[in-house]
Design a protein with these regions (language model features):
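Bacterial N-terminal signal peptides that target proteins for export
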Residues: 4-13, 17-30
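C-terminal motif of bacterial Sec signal peptides marking the signal peptidase cleavage site
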Residues: 40-42
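Bacterial signal peptide processing site
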Residues: 44-47
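N-terminal low-complexity, Pro/Thr/Ser-rich intrinsically disordered segments
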Residues: 49-84
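Acidic, divalent-cation-chelating loop motifs in proteins
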Residues: 89-93
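Acidic, aromatic-lined catalytic clefts of primarily extracellular/periplasmic carbohydrate-active enzymes
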Residues: 100-149
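Domain-level detector of nuclease and nuclease-like folds
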Residues: 129-255
């Protein structure tokens, strides 16, 4: 009969017991035979390995950081305008180029620029993080957007409406919150949070959600209960994923 020892089955030979009309009278003998077999070396009764409890979640992981996010309901969208976050694509890092061109230059391949060295004229996004496909970028008729991982409207409804203008400008131009992505996928996302939209490219979901957690932690934005549950579900599939860091300061000038 098989016995489990240190997680593996070991076999012990037991003389078979065949039922007969004398079954009742032989039951004590069968019981004795079984007990003797179990007493043989290597046949002792041992428990299998106990289920291993999950280890502690690292505070440096995206999953650990999710636990620290404040949970509240979504505030009204009343008063939201894109202009509340400043003019689009400022030069917050003072390198002479707008944020959009900085992100394009960093995240596209085969980049060509105009004579001033700032404007990105063409390039290739391969792979596109949201779909996993290949997207060509040509300035003026682009199929590539620069997406805010945490949408401006979502931020507005979860704390940003109480920020200073300077902090909102920093948020809108922070590279930590920006990714070049397929325009069609980005527009399907809209201002959705993790509970309502995830990239079709499943391989990117951990990176995507970890980025959202990092941004919300950095800027002190809250999450809804459904959003936190969705974040946790994704990040449990990659519990060691580190929380992204860096980006720009949380205050920015007006140009």
């Amino acid at each position: 009969m098989p016995r489990r020892r240190h997680g593996r089955l070991r076999w012990c030979v037991v003389t078979p017991f065949h039922a007969s009309p004398r079954t009742r009278r032989l039951l004590p003998i069968a019981a004795l035979t079984l007990a003797s077999a179990l007493a043989l070396p290597g046949c002792e009764i041992t428990d299998g390995p106990a289920d291993t409890a999950p280890g502690p979640v690292s505070a440096n992981s995206a999953l650990g950081a999710t636990d620290g996010l404040t949970v509240k309901g979504r505030a009204p969208k009343t008063g939201y305008e894109r202009s509340a976050f400043g003019s689009a694509w400022l030069d917050t890092d003072r390198n002479g180029c707008g944020t959009r061109d900085d992100i394009l230059a960093e995240q596209l391949d085969d980049v060509s620029r105009d004579s001033d060295g700032c404007k990105v004229l063409s390039g290739v996004l391969d792979p596109d993080p949201y779909t996993g496909g290949r997207v060509a970028f040509v300035r003026g008729r682009s199929k590539v957007d620069i997406d805010h991982l945490v949408a401006l409207s979502d931020a507005w409804q979860k704390g940003a409406q109480k920020w200073s203008d300077s902090k909102r400008r920093a948020f809108a131009n922070d590279p930590l919150n920006l990714v070049a992505a397929d325009s069609s996928a980005n527009r399907r996302k809209g201002d959705g949070d993790t509970a309502t939209w995830l990239p079709p490219n499943k391989e990117y979901r951990c990176t995507y959600v970890a980025g959202q957690v990092a941004v919300k932690k950095k800027y002190g934005l809250w999450v809804t209960a459904a959003e936190k549950d969705a974040m946790t579900t994704v990040l449990k599939s990659c519990p060691d994923r580190k929380l992204p860091s860096g980006g720009n300061p949380t205050e920015a000038g007006s140009r």
